[in-house]
């Protein structure tokens, strides 16, 4: 189980990303449209003034049940070992154990 503080930090990052998403996207579009270098530097400065944690690259997917940050499957939102346990217990519909 991940520390609760790390999970809360990730939730805070998600809120910041949602809050500044439109500002960030519009600034990036403006940079591509402006031909002058000085104008690009000005808009780049605005981007730099936004909070660091509001960037989408700072977000990290976590396991829904344990909060584990590694080996997550997007389809289920679970980490690998929890996914395996749930499939073995027949708790995930449509997921079957592989056999060959």
From Swiss-Prot:
Question: What is the stated purpose of this protein?
Answer: Binds 16S rRNA, required for the assembly of 30S particles.
**Which Pfam families does the UniProt record give?**
Ribosomal_S14
What family does the database annotate?
Belongs to the universal ribosomal protein uS14 family.
Q: Which UniProt keywords apply?
A: Chloroplast, Plastid, Ribonucleoprotein, Ribosomal protein, RNA-binding, rRNA-binding
This chain belongs to which protein, by name? Small ribosomal subunit protein uS14c
What does the entry give for GO biological process?
translation
Question: Where do the TM regions start and end?
Answer: none
What is the source species? Platanus occidentalis
Location(s) in or outside the cell: Plastid, Chloroplast
An example GO CC term for this entry is:
chloroplast
Q: How does it assemble?
A: Part of the 30S ribosomal subunit.
Give a GO molecular function annotation for the protein. structural constituent of ribosome
Q: Kindly give the HAMAP family that the UniProt entry links to this protein.
A: Ribosomal_uS14_1
Q: Does the keyword Ribonucleoprotein apply?
A: yes
């Amino acid at each position: 189980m991940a520390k609760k503080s790390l999970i809360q930090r990730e939730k805070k990052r998600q809120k910041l990303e949602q809050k500044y998403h439109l500002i960030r996207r519009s600034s990036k579009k403006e940079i591509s449209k402006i031909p002058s270098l000085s104008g690009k530097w000005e808009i780049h400065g605005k981007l730099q003034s936004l909070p660091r944690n509001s960037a989408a690259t700072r977000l990290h997917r976590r396991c829904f049940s344990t909060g584990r940050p590694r080996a997550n499957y997007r389809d289920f939102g679970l980490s690998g070992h929890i996914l395996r346990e749930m499939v073995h217990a027949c708790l995930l519909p449509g997921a079957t154990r592989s056999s060959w």
